């Protein structure tokens, strides 16, 4: 038995798991095989616990399928694989990158639990403006299925900056928590290393600083400032679009930071390759580390957000009221918090108790607008236009995938975005049974986990219908 056994496991896991999960949890592992024991080394305790909880059965099953009764025992450790005398024994889960990336990516040290972070040079002379908001932490970020991977990735970066997930690219619609996670990472890094030079900014600030440096003949100072930070957190990178000089400077800054194992975190409202007006070489680099989507919060998360926000304001919010608001306002966290602030303000001004009837009155115009915007008819038209088919196709008996999948998507959206029952949704789709609607909803939920394209389609349609 040889260490190629772990490589076989990696190949199978890469085929079986979504790309994001494999990159986030399996790729950072290192392996050592001795005395019929396979030791897997995780970069930190968080990764170790997650892999053991979520993937232990998968890995043991693969070991048994490859080795039968001779399958090695599995052991988990935090840290890096001990150095051995035989170089070829060093086996990690670093699956080969595409050829074009290998040709263009700058050379840098292999990630480890230290990641070169403790060897960062002493602070240079610039005065750093952190701009990190201390109020945004991981503790007050409400986690749900829609943002679980993004939060986990951000947590790992905060614990191990400059490591396997560099750069970290978070994308999703407005008001979903991307900025909160940026600040949470910054706070996490500085809690671990108080003297760390962590800089948060909107992409437009980078552009403004560069323009000012050019005007003042201070471009070298500009370069020194941005290339000597320990972590650079840039929000809304899509605003670099069509700014060629800024993109050129950021390209070189990006390379310099990566070569120094300095952490980069970027956010955008769309997937990197879909950002128009940004050079391909930059978009390619955005995907070198880990790219994670944040989706609109599902119902349970929306309720949790409202309850937590109310608790922070020392407001008693009945569960049924939180559910009522969450069921009707679905687009993003910012909208939810704004609606709750409005309810709280009205309650304070009038001295009335917060009930469903009170909320219905306080949010009357907002709820009316939502109900007007999101109807089954509107969903059908939007989905048909998105997939370039006819509304009549969605209502027909046709079962070809080109029609069936959009129909399932439309049904799932109707369940998510309206208050109609399953039988009512079925009636609106050509008189179908409620079990057909339920199957469609479950199918789309499954495909969102397995298919990046379906996940993107769902997010894009939610964004369109909720805007």
Curated annotation (Swiss-Prot):
Show the Pfam families listed in the entry: Bac_DnaA (PF00308), Bac_DnaA_C (PF08299), DnaA_N (PF11638)
Q: Where in the cell is it found?
A: Cytoplasm
Compositionally biased residues, Low complexity: 98-111
**Family in the record:** Belongs to the DnaA family.
Binding residue positions for ATP: 175, 177-179
Recorded domain comment: Domain I is involved in oligomerization and binding regulators, domain II is flexibile and of varying length in different bacteria, domain III forms the AAA+ region, while domain IV binds dsDNA.
Q: Where is this region: Domain III, AAA+ region?
A: 131-347
- What is this protein's name? Chromosomal replication initiator protein DnaA
Q: Which Gene3D superfamilies match?
A: 1.10.1750.10, 1.10.8.60, 3.30.300.180, P-loop containing nucleotide triphosphate hydrolases
């Amino acid at each position: 038995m040889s260490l190629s056994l772990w490589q076989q496991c990696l190949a199978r896991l890469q085929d079986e798991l979504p790309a994001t999960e494999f990159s986030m949890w399996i790729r950072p592992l290192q392996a050592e095989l001795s005395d019929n024991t396979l030791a897997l080394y995780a970069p930190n305790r968080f990764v170790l616990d997650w892999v053991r909880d979520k993937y232990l059965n998968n890995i043991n099953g693969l070991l048994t399928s490859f080795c039968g009764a001779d399958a090695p025992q599995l052991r988990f450790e935090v840290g890096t694989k001990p150095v051995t005398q035989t170089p070829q024994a060093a086996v990690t889960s670093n699956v080969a990158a595409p050829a074009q990336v290998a040709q263009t990516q700058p050379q840098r040290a292999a990630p480890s639990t230290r990641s070169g972070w403790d060897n960062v040079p002493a602070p240079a002379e610039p005065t750093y403006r952190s701009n990190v908001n201390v109020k945004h932490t991981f503790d007050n970020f409400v986690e749900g299925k829609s943002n679980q991977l993004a939060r986990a990735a951000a947590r790992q970066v905060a614990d191990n900056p400059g490591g396997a997930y560099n750069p970290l690219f978070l994308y999703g619609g407005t008001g979903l928590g991307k900025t909160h996670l940026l600040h949470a990472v910054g706070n996490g890094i500085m809690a671990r290393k108080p003297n760390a030079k962590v800089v948060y900014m909107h992409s437009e600030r980078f552009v403004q600083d560069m323009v000012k440096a050019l005007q003042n003949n201070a471009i070298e100072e500009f370069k020194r400032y941005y290339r000597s930070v320990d972590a650079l957190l840039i929000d809304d990178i899509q605003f670099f679009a069509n700014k060629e000089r800024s993109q050129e400077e950021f390209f070189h800054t990006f390379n310099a930071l990566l070569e120094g194992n300095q952490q980069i975190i970027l956010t955008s409202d769309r997937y990197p390759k879909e950002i128009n007006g940004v050079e391909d070489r930059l978009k390619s680099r955005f995907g070198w580390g880990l790219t994670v989507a944040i989706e609109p919060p599902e119902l349970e998360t929306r309720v949790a957000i409202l309850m937590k926000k109310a608790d922070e304001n020392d407001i008693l919010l009945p569960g049924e009221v939180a559910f009522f608001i969450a069921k009707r306002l679905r687009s993003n966290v910012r909208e939810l918090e704004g609606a709750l602030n409005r309810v709280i303000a009205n309650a304070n001004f009038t001295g009335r108790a917060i009930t469903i009837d009170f909320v219905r009155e306080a949010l009357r115009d907002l709820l009316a607008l939502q109900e007007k915007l999101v109807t089954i008819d509107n969903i059908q038209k939007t989905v048909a236009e998105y997939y370039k088919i006819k509304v009549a196709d969605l209502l027909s008996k046709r079962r070809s995938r080109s029609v069936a999948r959009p129909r399932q998507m439309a049904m799932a959206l109707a369940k998510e975005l309206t208050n109609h029952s399953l039988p009512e949704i079925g009636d609106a789709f050509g008189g179908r049974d409620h079990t057909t609607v339920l199957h469609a909803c479950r199918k789309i939920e499954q495909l969102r986990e397995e298919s990046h394209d379906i996940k993107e389609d769902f997010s894009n349609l939610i964004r369109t219908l909720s805007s």
